[in-house]
Amino acid sequence: MALTKAEMAEKLFDEVGLNKREAKEFVDAFFDVLREALEQGRQVKLSGFGNFDLRRKNQRPGRNPKTGEEIPISARTVVTFRPGQKLKERVEAYAGSGQ
């Protein structure tokens, strides 16, 4: 099950005490700042969580799965996420607990 922006705003409402409008604006602003930084080619480092980076991928050969025809996959920039050590440890501990 995925965590949505609406659920994040609801958590802020419940746990931090922001009203619902403020919580939604906070979540939207957070993602806007992340998006803007990445659009400017900057790395985003969230201490204790992980890093968002831009990675350049070169053009490469691909294949149309329906026809088998070779087609070029164009060069592009992709966003990658590398989890931080603390996040890895917490996820591994949760996964190991059998939940």
Curated annotation (Swiss-Prot):
This protein is one of the two subunits of integration host factor, a specific DNA-binding protein that functions in genetic recombination as well as in transcriptional and translational control. GO terms for biological process: DNA recombination; positive regulation of metabolic process; regulation of DNA-templated transcription; regulation of translation. Signal peptide: none annotated. The keyword Acetylation does not apply. GO terms for cellular component: cytosol. This is Integration host factor subunit alpha. It comes from Stenotrophomonas maltophilia (strain K279a). Pfam families: Bac_DNA_binding. Heterodimer of an alpha and a beta chain. SUPFAM superfamilies: IHF-like DNA-binding proteins (SSF47729). Keywords: DNA recombination, DNA-binding, Transcription, Transcription regulation, Translation regulation. One of its GO terms (molecular function) is structural constituent of chromatin. The gene is ihfA. InterPro entries: Hist_DNA-bd, Histone-like_DNA-bd_CS, IHF-like_DNA-bd_dom_sf, IHF_alpha. Belongs to the bacterial histone-like protein family.
